Amino acid sequence: MTDSLSLAEARALVLDCQGLASRSTFGSGSAGTKKAIEHLGYVQIDTLSVVARAHIHTLWNRVAAFKAADIDTLQQRGAIFEHWAHALAFLPMRDYRFSLPMMQRIASGESHWYKKDPKQTRKVLQRIREEGPLTAKDFTDKKSSDTMWARSPSKRALETLFMEGELMIPRRKNFHKVYDLRERVLPEGVDASMPSQDELCRHLIVSNMRAHGLALSSEMAYLRKGLGARMAQTAANMVEEGVLQRIRVGDQEYYSTTENLNRLGQKQPSPKLRILSPFD
């Protein structure tokens, strides 16, 4: 039998699991910021700033006394790293291994934004190996055109090496990525074993349940290349195992967990208005 939730109950569950019931849910400062990113699974990075970048806004809404410098502190300590979730994001370093499948696909020849230029990537990699961490501005070659998305050969090589995992971002300088070799950035002891597809799907499902409270399998596989059918099958298997359960909200059936459903009614949402970023 499929249990059901009212729209109001579903909304309350999502707000609670998203950490929006209170600005003290995760604590404060860099420790609270780390806890928030680990709970949410990732926070999308915003390259544009009008009032504030979206990732700053997202964390400010959840972490008491949050400052943008808290992200810098965590990144330089190796507690979080940058890579691709459904978009460029800050991710918990504890989840590093779950980015390896995408890195492997790019390294095996799949294009992300640009077709790989092996000669250029070797040249860029050699400079960083010899000179240490560099930004794109440290390379003086020019882009091929003035169009919005045009990039210089070195910038394309940096992004390819970053997506492959050969380069990581130990810090940003005036929000420009600083690139360095993975072996000089990845903390010792981080699990770098390649997950199976089943492990990856289970990780994404557990992360979604923790951060959202309920979700469709299609939402959990959003922009995760090639995982749609496997995600649906893994979610169904987890229902059989008693890890997930099916929940109906209106005409739509979602997945949730007993633990999440037991949260209903335990906390009253804050009556304060929260203005959320469109990326949130």
Residue positions per predicted region:
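Long, low-complexity intrinsically disordered regions
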Residues: M1-R274
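Short, intrinsically disordered, charge-balanced linker/junction segments flanking boundaries
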Residues: L276-D280
